[in-house]
Regions:
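Short beta-strand elements
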Residues: 430-449
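Glycoside hydrolase catalytic-domain context in secreted enzymes
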Residues: 1-430, 451-809
Length: 809
């Protein structure tokens, strides 16, 4: 097939063997199930309650047994052939003789949940029904083992336990309905059990000896109700496991899969124990990142008194077997910290272990977290008694801190003098300190930059000793002279304009392309891209800077679309948990586990495999750009979109995202890494200002993007909706040109998120190449004519868009 012909051809050409489609194929669904099992985390297993012995009789409690949540809402939703809930998964195990089920209970829940669905409820947003006492009595007579399933749903555009306090802020009608519905179901917010769930749990505990809990959730939830509860000896964090998540959970509880997932977030005793909770809902117009770099375990392992608030530490996860990790050696070699270790399976079952290497930098003048993850490695499946040697390494410069106030060297990464210590283990809390240290006699500047994207309204930030330091404030950046700002209502939800230029037919346009400048000449080496762009009229270049109409099964619009110049219309598609195609198209794709679960595998190779499989589905359906991965940090459990993001730790997020991008782009379709950056709150996300220090910005919130840019070369980056220190992210030249391109040498294209509140020509000037889902050509043209933007600035963005298109096959 010739260059770009796939983008013109409908229906699709199958990419599978023997003319079969790969989209939603049995092979991809099996991979989804495998990944789900790999990422589930066993957080409690007293008395070896799990796995269930063969033939165990089981009673299934909780509407979550039926009301399974495969993933979050919004861009993360996926149209699939089927969704396997936990009851269906356990029935498959029963058919194989592994367990025996008391069916009347799930049948009761099935009837109730169907009634709630019929009344308009969606998975995860249903009410826990009261179980009839006679059913409990019959179940108790049948068995002493019960499994409770708790489920949660969240989605794009709204946060958990959302509170709107600011006068003058008006909710959209769908936002209002979602918030009201959530409040009516989750009396204390969905971080905690509902009253109905709590009553059900108490009833089960009172009647059954062995109580197991399966948590079908997308992010952090309350764990205090089961952590020290003797009546609940086993708990599996099953997350949102995609279309086969219910069967994958059954695989784990029956022992067909030995859990090897590890937590990628810290689970504190209460929601109030997270430093971000205090001001998360303080205002809809801004969020102060006062905790600074002390996010997640960096806070709980460092700040005095915080460690005791942790129920389950970052990196924690149990197995049905046991492992012994021995450090064989540690050294600094060629600018890298290198640690060699051996892992031996000392138990009776085959299993996998994750070796985690942390470092602790000297406090110095800047202050540092007590521990920071430097590297990690997951073993292969080790048989009983088998040993594997692993090597973990990272550069010495990775331990540098950014000095944003000039305490050591202004706007520089510095390694402060002193001893750097190291820890190896299978979670941050239990990692053992090594005898080896890296000693630095003098402070060293590893990279010198300039101040970019600095805060103006952030008044204070947390220090390592638990106190706060005051930060300089001012009135904020002064906006350059330009056109009067558009009314925000004109920036909401408009479709790309379809212009019938002199009513020319497509054939006429193709004929024109034979004599016009043609992008195919660049493909064939007849002219350079610069030469091609120089020949295009300014109006054509401006046209390229906005989204284009959908073709085929696409519903998130295209890029390019100048056939008279040989430029194809490259389609985009959501989303993070699988290729998202509207149900009316009749195309079922594969729903992968949510990003948090994938991160919990601690297995970049597996994530890359999923990226490749997902990329095949995207390509087969004539889509060019897949709007994933999303790598924002789990700053707070309250963010409604955490299921779509990987972790509280930027290294895990970056390594996971880079693996996904490599897999996707091996199929020559483009990744769009999002949301750049600090999109850690959904409420008023288009106008909320994230106030964050330069240090926290670089060390925490930009770091995952930096890793992906340097390790995976993504075709595109998606700028976020929010403001960052008073400047719209899509108009933020400091970020898009200064850091992304100037410091990291990013060569790809930047797109806005869909229907941002940024002014199109200002976004272009900042280095945001294309405005999605539609551009405002007349505004850019007016700004050009009035001298507020130059042809060179327009052409630079157009060239980056065309470079991206040239990378497609």
């Amino acid at each position: 097939m010739g260059k770009w012909q796939r983008s013109l051809y409908q229906p699709v050409l199958p990419l599978g063997k023997d003319g079969k489609r790969v989209t939603g194929s049995a092979e991809h669904i099996a991979l989804s199930r495998k990944a789900a099992g790999e990422g589930m985390v066993l957080v409690k297993n007293e008395n070896d309650t799990l796995p269930l012995a063969k033939g165990t009789k089981v009673a299934l409690f909780g509407k979550g047994t039926i009301d399974y949540v495969k993933g979050g809402g919004g861009s993360g939703d996926v149209t699939v052939e089927y969704i396997r809930n936990f009851y269906e998964g356990m029935k498959i195990k029963e058919a194989k003789g592994e367990v025996s089920l008391f069916h009347e209970l799930p049948e009761f829940y099935e009837k109730n949940v169907k009634e709630q669905y019929a009344a308009g409820a969606v998975p995860g947003m249903t009410r826990e029904p009261e179980v009839p006492d006679e059913l409990v009595t019959k179940a108790k007579a049948y068995t002493d083992t019960a499994i409770i399933t708790i489920c949660r749903f969240s989605g794009e555009g709204w946060d958990r336990k959302c509170q709107i306090n600011d006068e003058g802020y008006e909710l959209f009608e769908d936002e209002k309905k979602q918030i009201e519905l959530s409040a009516s179901i989750f009396e204390n917010g969905d971080f905690y059990l509902t009253n109905g769930e709590a009553a059900m749990v108490e009833k089960v505990k009172a009647n059954f000896k062995n109580v197991i809990v399966v948590m079908n959730v997308g992010g952090m939830v309350d764990t205090s109700w089961f952590k020290d509860c003797k009546e609940v000896p086993a708990v599996l964090m099953a997350w949102q496991g995609g279309m086969e998540g219910g069967l994958a959970a059954a695989d784990v509880v029956t022992g067909d899969v030995n859990p090897s997932g590890k937590l990628v977030d810290t689970y504190a005793a209460t929601l109030e124990d997270y430093p971000s909770t205090e001001n998360f809902h303080k205002s809809v117009y801004y969020v102060d990142y006062n905790e600074d770099i002390y996010v997640g375990y960096r806070y709980f392992e460092t700040i005095p008194g915080a460690a005791e608030k942790v129920n389950y530490p970052f990196g924690f996860g149990l197995s049905y077997t046991s492992f012994e990790t021995e450090v064989l050696g540690a050294e600094e070699k060629d600018g890298k910290i290198v640690v060699k270790a051996s892992v031996t399976n000392t138990g009776k079952r085959a299993g996998k272990e994750v070796v985690q290497l942390y470092y602790g930098a000297p406090q110095g003048k800047l202050g540092k977290p007590a521990k920071e993850l430097g590297a990690y490695r997951k073993t292969r499946l080790l048989q009983s008694g088998e040993t594997q040697r692993v090597v973990l390494s990272f550069t010495v410069e990775d331990m540098a801190s950014f000095d944003d106030l000039g305490k050591v060297a202004k706007s520089a990464y510095v390694l402060e003098a002193g001893s750097y210590v190291f820890y190896v283990g299978n979670n941050v809390r239990d990692a053992k300190k090594l005898d080896f240290t890296y000693d630095l006699a003098e402070t060293k500047v590893t990279a010198q930059y300039t101040s970019l994207a600095a805060p103006h309204k952030l008044e204070k930030r947390l220090l390592a000793d638990g106190t706060y330091e005051a930060l300089p404030t001012d009135n904020g950046p002064v906006e350059e002279e330009g056109l009067e700002r558009q009314d925000k209502l004109t920036l909401e939800g408009f479709l790309p304009a379809v212009k019938a230029q002199e009513r020319k037919s497509f054939g006429e346009l193709m004929e024109a392309a034979k004599t016009n400048p043609n992008l195919m000449n660049v493909v064939e080496g007849k002219e350079t891209l610069d030469e091609f762009v120089d020949k295009l009229p300014t109006e054509a270049l401006i046209h390229l800077l906005g989204g284009q109409p959908n073709t085929g099964v696409a519903n998130t619009f295209g890029m390019g679309n100048l056939p008279e110049y040989g430029i194809p219309n490259i389609m985009t598609a959501d989303g993070p948990a699988g290729l998202r195609i509207q149900p009316q198209c009749g195309v079922n794709t594969t729903a992968w586990p949510c990003a948090t679960l994938l991160a919990c595998t601690w297995d970049p190779e597996l994530i890359e495999e999923i990226g490749k499989a997902g990329g095949e589905e995207v390509k087969e359906n004539n889509i060019g750009i897949w709007l994933t991965p999303a790598v924002n940090i789990h700053r707070s459990p309250l963010c409604g979109r955490n299921f779509e993001y990987y972790s509280e730790d930027p290294l895990v997020a970056g390594k996971s995202g880079a693996a996904m991008v490599r897999g996707m782009q091996s199929e020559h379709i483009g990744a769009s890494v999002k949301h750049f950056c600090c999109n850690n709150k959904e409420t008023n996300r288009k106008d909320s200002d994230s106030r964050v220090s330069e240090r926290a910005l670089r060390e925490i919130y930009l770091k995952a993007f930096e890793i992906i840019v340097k390790e995976a070369d993504p075709y595109t980056i998606m700028s976020s909706y929010n403001l960052i220190n008073g400047v719209q992210a899509s108009e933020n030249k400091d970020l898009l040109t200064g850091i992304l391109r100037g410091e990291w040498d990013f060569k790809g294209m930047v797109t806005t998120d869909w229907w941002t509140h940024g002014e199109h020509y200002r976004e272009t000037k900042a280095g945001n190449d294309i405005k999605m889902a539609n551009g405002y050509e007349e505004r850019v043209q007016e700004a050009f004519e009035k001298g507020y933007i130059t042809r060179d600035e327009i052409a630079l963005c157009a060239k980056r868009i065309l470079t991206m298109i040239l990378r497609m096959d």
